[in-house]
Amino acid sequence: MSPPNCLLAVLALTVFIGANNALPITSRPIEGNVQRMVWEDWVNLDPEQRNLTKEKKITAKSIFTLPFRHCPQGHTLFNQLCIPQSNIDPTDLVKQELILAGGSNGSPPPPPIGDYDYGDDEESEEIVYDLSVIPTAMQDGLPPSVGTGDQALPSEDAPLKFNIFEKKFPTGTGEHEEMPLPPDMAAATYAKNISTTPETSTSITPTSTTTFAVPSVPSGEASNRIPGGVDLLAAPSDAFSTSTTLSMPTSNTTTTSNKDIGQVESIVLPADQEHDGLVHLVTSSLSDNDSDDSSTTLNGFNAEADLAQLLKVDAFWPVYDGSIELLPPLFSHRKVAPPLSADQDVKTKHAVDAAEKVGAELEEEVGEEEVTATDILPSEEDEYTTETATTTGDTTVAEASMDTSTATSTSGQSSPHPPEEPEIDERENRLVLIKSKVQPVQLTTTTSATATTAADVANSSSSTDRFHYQHFVEDESSTTTATPEPSSSTPGDPIEQSDMPASDNDNLMTNTIGGRGDDDDDGGHKATSEIHVQQELRLINELVKGKQRQQHQPQKQQLEPTSTEITSALTSTSTEDATTTTTTTTAYTNWSKVMPQLGQSTSETAATTETVATSGQVNEISLTATSASTEVKHFSITNRSYRNSKIIREDRLTVEPEGIVESAASTESAGTAATTPNSSSNPDGYTPLWWLPSIGWRLDRHLDGNGEDQSLLLRFFSTFRGSNTAATTR
């Protein structure tokens, strides 16, 4: 056990010696000669000085402090240097000003001397004067020195002294600051200083040179003026009491902000000036103004707060000077386009006539039976446009007059429109989808067999087309029109209008008048894009109704259900041959711009149905069940064409009625005979997906354990041979 003890003793001595000569554990590399010298002094200290406790001893932390931390008297620490400090007496500055001003005897100022310096090592650029030449009487008259006390820097260990509650508890001036009064008290105080003479009073709005004389204003409403000349545009949040009394030759209208806000009828803004904060609220003159002002002081503050929200200046001032409200509408003799909202009801002719009658009466009675709020600014009568808000009974009609012509807005519509917005394609055109009605099926007798051919379908009128073309210039509505003339149009006929010339400005309100001029006629001239779209739609309608036959391309054919109900007498036995032409829809691979073409292929199948009449009711029930079952089967097998991968194809029906096996077998044989040439074109049994055209590429189906298609991602590959169908299309 002795050798390990010896090793431990040697290791302890080595660590003790190394600790005396090495850096502290928490030290950093020595930077600079000063720190190195301090560290050497620390190492060379004797143990007695290191163990001093009463005096300030040197520790390892001292080497990381700046040298000359405690500068001698009259020096200041700056940039690791002790700079001599010279305290300037404030009286010296006063003496210099007196020397520059000159002595009392009118002698010139003495020449500057260089014995007064501020302590800079370099040459000072300041001018120093000799203070000995100042008269003694002048020195005695100087004020006593201020601030000549202790200007020494605070102690290095003293905490910083500053008031963090300066705003809440100010310590600077010591003067009493007057607290602002609440708005309601301020309004009540301001009301006491207003003259209450009932004869006449004058109200002057701020930032405006116009003075309005108001006769016979009650004293209770004089307190509603703006207190203290508050600018509404500069401080809208503080405008709690806003009122302006107006005087007009027809009626005296006085506004009060303590009343209900619902009485506000219009807001008058100056039209031809800059933003001067002049906002006027014109309320109804029928309101009760006889109430005492003291009764409304309780709920006045809430009403004023709501009115302040209503009077947000940025909500009423336009963004730029050429605003929407100030531009006159462009009236012209144009037809009116359908309005923007398609949910309005079509007005009757009686309503339009009544509106025109009201407009004619308004033109005669302007200025007689109405409360009018016009612009305050002076304007000439015939050269400028004045906007007038006219109130007659329950109807509010906006009237805009330019020179001598007056137009009245009516709510009548020009033409009936569909209740739903039609779809819009990329050329701003509308595709109106007209719902087709289901025609009733007529029952056939035993002596007549109905044969539906493609020629009969082609003879149908154009009014049964499912797609119609309607060309609209813009989405425009009429808000201000001049005697709209109704146009007669049916939903089946396309609405044809010529392009309206664009207006000079981009005003939203003035461009709402759409349509075309009275002198402009179509004349059959249409744009090329319009003709192309009409040709496409006509082609689609012909293909849907079976006007084109394309039998050169074999595809899978569909047998539409043919329900033949045979009514026979109870005592007779009849055998007839019913020749039925089945029209099937085939999807081809030459695709058009709008939708894939649909061709019609016909296949005539002769189905011989023998019925032995034992009971007429039994025959009808069995044959009706046969037609229903075959319809469900063929519809579910071939019509969907794998449009949904989760629909599993079934080859035959699981349950068939026993009494109709013969009829169903004949129908199935006809179906297999029709699909035989198509199935021979794909010997490997490949069935293309409905969305994949025959372009030489094929996509095999991979089924998982559940019988569903696997992921279609990255499973395209080319066989470079194509099918017979793809070869014929190339």
From Swiss-Prot:
<feature type="compositionally biased region" description="Low complexity">
    <location>
        <begin position="567"/>
        <end position="583"/>
    </location>
</feature>
<feature type="glycosylation site" description="N-linked (GlcNAc...) asparagine">
    <location>
        <position position="289"/>
    </location>
</feature>
<feature type="glycosylation site" description="N-linked (GlcNAc...) asparagine">
    <location>
        <position position="590"/>
    </location>
</feature>
<dbReference type="GO" id="GO:0070252">
    <property type="term" value="P:actin-mediated cell contraction"/>
</dbReference>
<dbReference type="InterPro" id="IPR031761">
    <property type="entry name" value="FOG_N"/>
</dbReference>
<feature type="glycosylation site" description="N-linked (GlcNAc...) asparagine">
    <location>
        <position position="459"/>
    </location>
</feature>
<dbReference type="GO" id="GO:0003383">
    <property type="term" value="P:apical constriction"/>
</dbReference>
<feature type="glycosylation site" description="N-linked (GlcNAc...) asparagine">
    <location>
        <position position="252"/>
    </location>
</feature>
<keyword id="KW-0732">Signal</keyword>
<dbReference type="GO" id="GO:0060662">
    <property type="term" value="P:salivary gland cavitation"/>
</dbReference>
<dbReference type="GO" id="GO:0000266">
    <property type="term" value="P:mitochondrial fission"/>
</dbReference>
<dbReference type="GO" id="GO:0007411">
    <property type="term" value="P:axon guidance"/>
</dbReference>
<dbReference type="GO" id="GO:0007186">
    <property type="term" value="P:G protein-coupled receptor signaling pathway"/>
</dbReference>
<feature type="region of interest" description="Disordered">
    <location>
        <begin position="197"/>
        <end position="222"/>
    </location>
</feature>
<dbReference type="GO" id="GO:0110072">
    <property type="term" value="P:apical constriction involved in ventral furrow formation"/>
</dbReference>
<feature type="compositionally biased region" description="Low complexity">
    <location>
        <begin position="386"/>
        <end position="415"/>
    </location>
</feature>
<feature type="region of interest" description="Disordered">
    <location>
        <begin position="474"/>
        <end position="526"/>
    </location>
</feature>
<feature type="glycosylation site" description="N-linked (GlcNAc...) asparagine">
    <location>
        <position position="678"/>
    </location>
</feature>
<dbReference type="GO" id="GO:0007472">
    <property type="term" value="P:wing disc morphogenesis"/>
</dbReference>
<keyword id="KW-0133">Cell shape</keyword>
<dbReference type="GO" id="GO:0040034">
    <property type="term" value="P:regulation of development, heterochronic"/>
</dbReference>
<feature type="compositionally biased region" description="Polar residues">
    <location>
        <begin position="504"/>
        <end position="513"/>
    </location>
</feature>
<dbReference type="GO" id="GO:0005615">
    <property type="term" value="C:extracellular space"/>
</dbReference>
<feature type="region of interest" description="Disordered">
    <location>
        <begin position="663"/>
        <end position="683"/>
    </location>
</feature>
<keyword id="KW-0217">Developmental protein</keyword>
<dbReference type="GO" id="GO:0007509">
    <property type="term" value="P:mesoderm migration involved in gastrulation"/>
</dbReference>
<feature type="glycosylation site" description="N-linked (GlcNAc...) asparagine">
    <location>
        <position position="193"/>
    </location>
</feature>
<feature type="glycosylation site" description="N-linked (GlcNAc...) asparagine">
    <location>
        <position position="639"/>
    </location>
</feature>
<dbReference type="GO" id="GO:0048383">
    <property type="term" value="P:mesectoderm development"/>
</dbReference>
<dbReference type="GO" id="GO:0007399">
    <property type="term" value="P:nervous system development"/>
</dbReference>
<feature type="glycosylation site" description="N-linked (GlcNAc...) asparagine">
    <location>
        <position position="51"/>
    </location>
</feature>
<feature type="compositionally biased region" description="Low complexity">
    <location>
        <begin position="478"/>
        <end position="491"/>
    </location>
</feature>
<dbReference type="GO" id="GO:0005737">
    <property type="term" value="C:cytoplasm"/>
</dbReference>
<dbReference type="GO" id="GO:0007374">
    <property type="term" value="P:posterior midgut invagination"/>
</dbReference>
<keyword id="KW-0272">Extracellular matrix</keyword>
<dbReference type="GO" id="GO:0007370">
    <property type="term" value="P:ventral furrow formation"/>
</dbReference>
<dbReference type="GO" id="GO:0007476">
    <property type="term" value="P:imaginal disc-derived wing morphogenesis"/>
</dbReference>
<dbReference type="GO" id="GO:0021782">
    <property type="term" value="P:glial cell development"/>
</dbReference>
<feature type="compositionally biased region" description="Acidic residues">
    <location>
        <begin position="361"/>
        <end position="385"/>
    </location>
</feature>
<keyword id="KW-0325">Glycoprotein</keyword>
<dbReference type="GO" id="GO:0048018">
    <property type="term" value="F:receptor ligand activity"/>
</dbReference>
<feature type="region of interest" description="Disordered">
    <location>
        <begin position="361"/>
        <end position="424"/>
    </location>
</feature>
